[in-house]
Amino acid sequence: MSGNRIQPRSVARLAAVQALYQMEVSGAGVDSVIREFGEHRFDRDVEGEQLAAADETFFADLARGVVTNQAKIDQGIVKRLASGWRLERLDATARAVLRAGAFELMYRSDVPTEVVINEYVEIAKSFFEGPESGFINGALDAIARDARD
């Protein structure tokens, strides 16, 4: 059973995507959202089940990193969208997944490319049942080639 336990960084990535989404739709600032997650969402019991522990430092680094570097991250994403597509045309959740993944690919060279892409594709699958995860896979792969080659 412990082999199925979600890794703390995986939990942090999912939380970062949720936080980025929350910031976009509510207009909340990064520090208040990080504080909210730390106080109310991590290490909590939900309906009798203990949630997996998150790497809270990694979570905060992801959230702050995306916000700090969002203009450059968005440029990297837009470069890989189909001709004529604008970032705003994407679903807010897809934008959050792409931004978090692109941040890691562009600014966290300590994390292997394959790990980043796989983690965010799995996160996308948890939100979408359609072709979005394939789109995110392709976009992150292209961003990785731009950022790491």
Curated annotation (Swiss-Prot):
- Keyword Transcription regulation applies: yes
Q: Which Gene3D superfamilies match?
A: NusB-like
Q: What are the GO cellular component annotations?
A: cytosol
Q: Which Pfam families match?
A: NusB (PF01029)
Molecular function GO labels: RNA binding
Coiled-coil portions: none
The record's listing under InterPro entries reads: NusB-like_sf, NusB_fam, NusB_RsmB_TIM44
Q: List GO BP terms, alphabetically.
A: DNA-templated transcription termination; transcription antitermination
Record's keyword terms, sorted = RNA-binding, Transcription, Transcription antitermination, Transcription regulation
Superkingdom classification of source: Bacteria
Q: Which HAMAP family does the record cross-reference, listed alphabetically?
A: NusB
* Recorded family membership: Belongs to the NusB family.
What the protein does comes down to: Involved in transcription antitermination. Required for transcription of ribosomal RNA (rRNA) genes. Binds specifically to the boxA antiterminator sequence of the ribosomal RNA (rrn) operons.
Protein name in UniProt: Transcription antitermination protein NusB
Q: Which organism is it from?
A: Caulobacter vibrioides (strain NA1000 / CB15N)
